[in-house]
């Protein structure tokens, strides 16, 4: 546990840098992130010290499937549970490779045609995990509307 907490500063910096790119672009784009756009996320393929196993990765934005929503991540905290899970000390090990981030807040940028509960522009709580990313594409049930 001490090793994890000593490396929290490095992990915080990594998450801040990823989050900064999302915040920096928030005011400069007026539409949805389109399929094929390159987006960043934090991931890991082995458990261990978060400061050494976490990587910022880039990949093409995922296509929406029926029932899916695309959300631009606005903020995602670093939870102690995230750090413990990355280190393999949480009690439930993730399927590797994994994407950390148990919660966050985002804005809906696109919805599939069959989604009625969420609308473009709506702020949502990210409840589907993998929140250390610039955007998430997941079933609408993984997002809770915010007032």
Enumerate the language-model features and the residues they cover.
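Short structural boundary motif marking the start of a folded domain
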Residues: 35-42
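Short N-terminal binding/cap micro-motifs at the start of the first secondary-structure element
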Residues: 48-54, 80-81, 117
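Conserved hydrophobic/aromatic beta-strand scaffold that supports enzyme active sites
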Residues: 56-58, 105-107, 135-137, 143
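Gram-negative bacterial Sec-dependent N-terminal signal peptides
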Residues: 5-26
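Cleaved targeting-peptide boundary
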Residues: 26-35
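Cytochrome P450 core scaffold surrounding the K-helix E-X-X-R motif
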Residues: 81-87
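Glycine-rich beta-strand-centered segment in the early N-terminal region that forms part
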Residues: 60-77, 89-131
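NAD(P)H dinucleotide-binding glycine-rich loop of Rossmann-like/cofactor-binding domains
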Residues: 84, 95, 123-147
């Amino acid at each position: 546990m001490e090793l994890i907490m000593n490396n929290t500063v490095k992990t915080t910096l990594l998450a801040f840098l990823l989050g900064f790119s999302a915040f920096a672009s928030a005011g400069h784009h007026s539409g949805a992130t389109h399929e094929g756009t390159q987006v960043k996320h934090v991931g890991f393929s082995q458990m261990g010290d978060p400061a050494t196993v976490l990587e910022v990765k880039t990949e093409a934005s995922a296509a929406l499937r029926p029932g899916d929503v695309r959300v631009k991540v606005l903020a995602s905290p670093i939870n102690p549970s995230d750090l413990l899970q990355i280190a393999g000390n949480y009690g439930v090990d993730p399927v590797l490779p994994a994407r950390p981030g148990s919660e966050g807040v985002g804005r809906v940028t696109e919805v599939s045609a069959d989604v009625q509960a969420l609308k473009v522009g709506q702020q949502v709580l990210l409840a589907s995990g993998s929140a250390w990313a610039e955007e998430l594409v997941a079933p609408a049930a993984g997002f809770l509307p915010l007032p």
